[in-house]
Every structure is written in C-alpha cells, then in structure tokens.
Amino acid sequence: MGTVTPMMQQYLDIKEQYKDCILFFRLGDFYEMFFSDAELASRELEITLTGRDCGLEERAPMCGVPFHAADNYIARLVSKGYKVAICEQVEDPALAKGIVKRDVVKVVTPGTVTDITMLDERKNNYLMSVYKNGNFYGLASVDITTGDFYATRITWGNTRGKLLDEIAKYLPSEIIVNNELNSDNELTSEIKQRFNTYVSTFEETSFEYGNSMDILANHFEKQTLNIQEYDIAVNASGALLKYLESTQKVNLSHIQKFNSYALEEYMILDASSRRNLELTETMREKSKKGSLLWVLDKTMTSMGGRLLRKWIEQPLINHGDISLRLDAVEELKNKFMVRVEARELLKRVYDIERLMGKVVLGSVNCRDLIALKNSMCQIPYIKSLLNGFEAEYIKNCGEQLDCLEDVCNLIEVSIIDEPPVTIKEGGIIKDGYNPEVDKLRMASIQGKDWIAALEASQREKTGIKNLKVGFNRVFGYYIEVTKSYFSLVPEEYIRKQTLSNCERYITPELKEIEDTILGAEEKIIQLEYSLFVEIKEKIAEQLSRIKSTARALAEIDVLASLAEVADREGYCKPEVSLSDKIEIIEGRHPVVEKMTDKSGFVPNDTVLDMEEDRLAIITGPNMAGKSTYMRQTALIVLMAQIGSFVPAATAKIGLVDRIFTRVGASDDLASGQSTFMVEMSEVANILINATKRSLLVLDEIGRGTSTFDGLSIAWAVIEYIVNKEQLGCRTLFATHYHELTELEGKLPGIKNYCITVKEKGEDVIFLRKIIRGGADGSYGIQVAKLAGVPQSVIDRAKEILSNLDDADINRSGKARRIKKQVDGQLDLFAQAAKASADAEILEEIRKIDISRLTPIDSMNILYELQRKMNNRE
C-alpha cells in the first residue's frame, strides 16, 4: 500500500478538522473536492466525477469547479442543507517553499450565508441557537448579514409549544443545539419536519454558562449586566457567537446590540395561528401573494421590507407604542405629496444594513461602496422632508437620520464612479486621491505612449509596414513581424517566439521600458488594494452611525408603506384602547377584497367584549363566508396592533394579548396524528394558554369525530370559554351543530349570528352578510351541487334526506326548543337521541317480511318493539 502525496496529506489533515463539511480545496484556478466529498458534490451539482493520483493504489475520486464561478455551486449545496468549508492558498505560490500553505478561511452554512445574491432581500436569514435544560429553553437568533441579534428564554407554561412558536416566528435556516436537546429525538425530528431547517449540535463547552458569559462580555462589553438577567438565554447566545466566530473567522463588530426580550412583551401568535391567518405566506402555495404581507408591503427598500415583515410577525401590546405608530401613519397618509416625494427618494436607497454587513465581514467591493454613497446622498433630502411633521415617531426618525457627509465624501473622492467588480486588479481609485498612485499611473501612461511611438519609429526605420508592438502575460512586450518581411529584420532584434505566420522579437530598449511599465502597474494594483482596505476600515469605524440611520430609514419606509395602503384601499384609523371591547363596523378581509372584485365584497360588523358579547356562535352553510369573516376580524385586530390602518368604516380595538385560531383540519401524517387528534391538540393548547385578553377564532370544533361526541366537546368548550372564572375571553365560534344556538340566553355572554342565504328554487345564493340569529339550515346538498358533484349523487342524496325526514329527523338540523333541563344544563342531546331511536325502530319494521310470520312470531316481534319503545321513553 502506497503513501499519499504531500498535497493529498495536506488535504486530509484539513478535512479531518471539518468532517461535517464539503471541503472546497483551492488548487490554482479551481476548487477541488476529493473522495466522499467529490462523490457527493458530483451527484448534487451534476458535475463530472474524475480521479487523481494521490499516492495510493487507487486514484482518488475528484471533481472541481472554477474559482470564479464557485459562488453559484456553493449556493446550490447550501440550499440543500450542506455546509461548505472554503480552503484557500494563504501564501504566494511564488514564495512558497514546498507545498503552498492552505487553510479554511470560511465555512458557509445555511444560517451563515453572506452572499446577498443567495438570499431573499426582503427576508432575514436567521441562524438560531437553542439551549435545553430540563423543560426550560434559551434561544438566540442572529442575521449575520444585518447584525440583528435577539435572545429570550422560555421557563413557564407549555415550554415545548412556546419553543416551536418562536421557531415559527423566526423560521431560521439553521439551528444549533446542545446535547440535551439533540438527544430529544422526538422534538428535533418535529423541528426538522415542520420547519424544513438544518439542525446540528455544536461543542457543548460553548453552551456552558461561564464560557458563554465570557464570550458575550468580550463582544458586547458594557451590555453584560443586562445580559446576566436572562440566565439560560446566555447559554444559547454565547454558543451562537462562538459558532459564528468559528465559521466566519472575521470581525463580527456589526453585531452591536444584545436585544433581549420576554415573550409577553409582544402579542403571542402560535404556529397554528400564523399559518391559519396567512400572515407572510399562503398555506397551500407558500407564496407571499395572497398573504397579509403581500397587501401591506409597498415598501421601497429591502430594509423596510424586512422590518414590515417583523412588525407583522410581532404585533405590539403596549398601547402607547401602538398609538405612536398610528399617529405617524395618519400624518403620512394626510400629507400625500410629501409621502410621494419621500417614497421616490427611498426608492434610490440600497440595502444599507447588508452593505455594512459586507464592509465588516470583508466581502464588500467598490460597487457596493458606490451603492452606499448613492444611498447616503438621499438622506439630506429625506431629513428635510420630515422637518414639518408633528407625529412624535416621525420626528424621532428624523433626529436619528445622520446625513453622513464625511462618509459620503470619502467614497466620492476616492472610488471611481463605475468601478470593476474585482478589487485586486486595480482601476478602482480616483485620480487625485493619492499622489503615489497618480505618479505611478503617469509612469505607466508615459511608458505606453513611448511604446506607441516606438512602433511608429520602427516601421519607418526598418521599412516593415505591418510591424506592430504587442503584449501578452507570458512574454511581456514584443515586436511582431510577418514572414514576408523577415529579410528586413534588424540584427539587434532578439527572436523570442516563432509562430506559423510570424516571429516575435524583443530589444534591450523595449525590455527596459517594459520593466518600467509593468513595475508601475504591479505597484499600482498593490497600492490601490491597500487604499481600498484603508477606506473600508474608515467606513467600518462609522458603523454605529450608519446602522442607526439605516434603521430610521427602514422605519420611515414602513410607515409610508402603511400610509400608502391606507390611502389606496380606503382604510380607517382604528381606535386602540385598554378597554375590552372590539367593535368593527363594515369590516373587510384585507386579502380577499384585494384578490377579488372589491365592489363585490360584502362588509360585516363585529362586536365582542367580555360581558354580553363574549362569544359569538356563527352558523351557516359551508362556502357562505364564515371562515372569511372570522379571519378578517383577527386580521383587523392584528393590523391595528402593528400600527396599521384597517379595512373598515370604523374600528374600536380593545387590546388583545394573543390571538388563537383553530380553522380547518388535516391529518398530521408525519407525527401519526389523525385529523381529530390534531384538532383536539390545538384546542387544548388554546384553552391552556389563552387569557382573559385573548381573542379566540374557533371553526368547527368537534367535527372530526361522531356527532354526539363532537357536539359534547363543542358545548363543553363553549361553557369553559364563557365562564369568567375559567376564561371569559372574546371568541368567534363557528359551528354546524345548530343545537348550540340554544345556548344563547342560557349561558351568559353568548350571541347567535348567521350568514344570510337566499333560496332560489333548489339553488341557494350566499349573501355573505352576518346577521343576528341562528341559521335555518346547512344547505349541504346545494353546496355539493355548487361544487360540481355529479347530478346522480345529488339526486340520491335528496332521496336519502327525504327518507331521513320520514324517520322524524329534522332536515334543517335546527334544534327543537328544549324545556327539560338536567342538573341546571340544557338537555340538548335528548331530542337528537330520541330521533335516532325512532329511526332504528322504523327501520326494523321496514325489514319485517310479514308474509312469512307465524302468529307467535308476530306477537314476539310486537312485544320486543313495545319493550324498546318503553325503554326509549
């Protein structure tokens, strides 16, 4: 067995340190992969798998990609959940003694992508760290491209459920966990399946409290005292920073603030409610179009787009903060011309947050700096527009805007207006910025002028009419003469290269000027790069000022976007208060009215409080608009609490601390849960975690099981909710159990509502208007007909329904008036049970073959039927 070559041994030594990564190993102009990495990469990237002699008996499997095109291949691997370690040559091959030194300069993972072209510009790319200690969890999240860093802890209640809810809020691309969480196979599997995210363990020592505090204290310095208050969030935060340091291997100074928060500081939205309300994407297509974000996002900048998404995902519960936003939106809505001008200026602002991330992380180029300069040029005009505003929020934003003239001027005088992408080939520094660069450029230019003059003089001197002076990287400058003029070549010409149709020569004089030109150009390239690094570092020193300004621009952008939507769509300013009353007049669903003919959308009122209008029971057929109505109420409340105007004539919103929705049902095949089990799990979560200030939106509770079981559960849930000692919160409750409408007047705080329907022959027209009272029928067969069910099935359904009518089962399903009470509660089931027993006895009578009965048989059957009737009563 052979011994591997020195180069391959170097590869294996580095690969040993990065076992969980695909190693991109730089060899000349290519990144090469070997052995199992090569086999994996060739399959995933669909590139050719070859081999390379490595000193062993068999050739090493190998594949590679050009270094200049590597970003695209790295992006494809990372998008599939792989980590990629970038191994570069860290010394000049010309100066190397033996094997060129190589080392990993960066590890690219799903959560640490810094290449903006690989990311959604309007969405944060979060890396999350989760630390588990018993039933407690510490969380930390960071977007490395912007420097946003957040941390919290989960130490009470259903901590597992709250953890999943926080993950649903951030939707991280990658999660690192400690060993205790990793050993919880059920939880880690659920996280991977539900959120389609990359989960891996990280060194346990980095999760230890002492080590984490040291890491955080070293990075955040003066903020350490505040950090200590968040105990197990410290463990997660320290590990997160350590992971970034170990993968990025660069300065992380753009992560400037430790933003700690408690879950209760914002409206709580569980994962199910976020999904059901389609806040940022639709349930089916996972598309932005059709979501609330799609309606509200008229932002002009990427920064504003990301901030608006965050506002929607994290509504406020502080009345004062909400009022500040609403007042700002109102003034921007009213000042139409100023808003238009401000938005036009914002359109010219690039993604300052991510550009500054590139500055600090070392991936910025000159075109990025020009984009930064052009963005800063808009700030004085935007600041001037804000001077006349009265809204406190806007005035604060104006004060935060720093015109950054010094930074803008630095880039203006130093970087050419249209620079190349690369920063290592010169041609990026303006004339007049640096005397040495100017001097070297003059030498280079003069040398090239001399070359041009030489060509003319040599033609005249030799008589070679097509003589020319050329250049290539291998031979440098040369004099080229074609075959037809070989006889005229002077003796002092030194032959350098022979080609099929010509020969190339040099002269001592040409070689001397070549040294001058090339020496100057090489020095220019080195000097320009050094100057670029110096300029970049000067800009990085102003990071705090620039980030603060970028944040203010993003806030103005979001407020202006909300004002624009309010103006275009005819939204009203909601009156948000600390009361318990929700009163929406002529409310509309913000998305549905946008997706359909606006003039055809039927507005509806909503009244909820914690007294007489605690719980609204809503009945009506499928497709009539119950779900739309309930969702629109939840969305209007949420919109009000992010500081947005709302689609209604008027709206009074008593603050809501959390919104829970139970809408629709489907089997959770991944966890082996049936539709009914999923439904009951969601109901349990709601009843356990809801408070008196919560808003519940419940649709078809109990429909996943038998009629009597479902009715029993729905009834019990209503009892629990309306009971002030147990819950007593504001609730919309849609149901097909018409028997539940009898609860109005029997239990406190319940009101019946229904969707109006117009019958036209055997057809129905859904009027989509909510009115007081219970529905007259479910219209199931008519809905089936509208859905396109074959006519033969419709006809058979009518026949069966008619037979059931004969069996004395009320066709409409409408509850009969109940006089009897059992233990102080309504006997809602007695009548339904009686009807079911009657139907069974009638069916037995139908099956009797009278022609074959003896008198004794007849008497026995009659006796048995009588016994059943007596037992029924």
From Swiss-Prot:
GO cellular component terms given for this protein: cytosol
Coiled-coil parts of chain: none
InterPro entries assigned to the protein according to its UniProt record, in alphabetical order: DNA_mismatch_repair_MutS, DNA_mismatch_repair_MutS-lik_N, DNA_mismatch_repair_MutS/MSH, DNA_mismatch_repair_MutS_C, DNA_mismatch_repair_MutS_clamp, DNA_mismatch_repair_MutS_core, DNA_mismatch_repair_MutS_N, DNA_mismatch_repair_MutS_sf
A single GO BP: mismatch repair
Annotated ATP binding sites: 620-627
Keywords associated with the record: ATP-binding, DNA damage, DNA repair, DNA-binding, Nucleotide-binding
Recorded GO MF terms: ATP binding; ATP-dependent DNA damage sensor activity; damaged DNA binding; mismatched DNA binding
PROSITE patterns in the cross-refs: DNA_MISMATCH_REPAIR_2 (PS00486)
Pfam families: MutS_I (PF01624), MutS_II (PF05188), MutS_III (PF05192), MutS_IV (PF05190), MutS_V (PF00488)
Domain of life (superkingdom): Bacteria
PANTHER family for the chain: DNA MISMATCH REPAIR PROTEIN MSH1, MITOCHONDRIAL, DNA MISMATCH REPAIR PROTEIN MUTS FAMILY MEMBER
Alphabetical list of NCBIfam families matching this protein: mutS1 (TIGR01070), PRK05399.1 (NF003810)
Similarity annotation: Belongs to the DNA mismatch repair MutS family.
Protein name: DNA mismatch repair protein MutS
Organism: Ruminiclostridium cellulolyticum (strain ATCC 35319 / DSM 5812 / JCM 6584 / H10) (Clostridium cellulolyticum)
Source species taxonomy: Bacteria, Bacillati, Bacillota, Clostridia, Eubacteriales
